[in-house]
Curated annotation (Swiss-Prot):
InterPro entries: Ribosomal_uL5, Ribosomal_uL5_bac-type, Ribosomal_uL5_C, Ribosomal_uL5_CS, Ribosomal_uL5_dom_sf, Ribosomal_uL5_N. Pfam families: Ribosomal_L5 (PF00281), Ribosomal_L5_C (PF00673). GO terms for biological process: translation. HAMAP family: Ribosomal_uL5_B (MF_01333_B). Part of the 50S ribosomal subunit; part of the 5S rRNA/L5/L18/L25 subcomplex. Contacts the 5S rRNA and the P site tRNA. Forms a bridge to the 30S subunit in the 70S ribosome. This is Large ribosomal subunit protein uL5. The gene is rplE.
């Protein structure tokens, strides 16, 4: 079992229950899922790029990504409906907690010129989204085998009702928000 999950149950739940005066433990916000998305627009010209992106996302997440396809044709981007343009992974349960732990302890500190994550990236319902410019911050990616530096989007979906609750939840895990 992931250490952060134990920490959540033993410490964070009690802290947040006291802070927001919840009557039940079930009212305390929790992390529901973490979604990783990698858009590969260049996959239109070279199919190998999408395969490499899928391999990177598989190494980072530990599970096989779903290839996302264009929903509609856009002439300006030279894409047609159904073209593969990216990949995504939804992590839940044990894999989610393990990824979250690696994200906080290993990956985020390796971001170049890191000064903290923006606390304004909440969506109004307690969900947090962040972008990573380089996939090489994750230790699972071998720097020598990378053909191209790609970014990815990470969305942390919580059961929080407001941004304040969501931020308190992530801050309880020592999420590195900018001061």
């Amino acid at each position: 079992m992931a250490k952060l999950h134990d920490y959540y149950r033993d410490q964070v739940v009690n802290e947040l229950k006291a802070k927001f005066n919840y009557s039940s433990v079930m009212q305390v916000p929790r992390i529901e899922k973490i979604t990783l998305n990698m858009g590969v627009g260049e996959a239109l010209t070279d199919k190998k790029l999408l395969d490499n992106a899928v391999a990177d996302l598989t190494a980072i997440s530990g599970q096989k990504p779903l290839i996302t396809k264009a929903r509609k044709s856009v002439a300006g981007f030279k894409i047609r409906q159904g073209y593969p343009i990216g990949c995504k992974v939804t992590l839940r349960g044990e894999r989610m907690w393990e990824f979250f732990e690696r994200l906080i302890t290993i990956a985020v500190p390796r971001i170049r010129d890191f000064r903290g994550l923006n606390a304004k990236s909440f969506d109004g319902r307690g969900n947090y989204s962040m972008g990573v410019r380089e996939q090489i911050i994750f230790p699972e990616i071998d720097y020598d085998k990378v053909d191209r530096v790609r970014g990815l989007d990470i969305t942390i979906t919580t059961t929080a009702k407001s941004d304040e609750e969501g931020q308190a939840l992530l801050a309880a895990f020592n999420f590195p928000f900018r001061k």
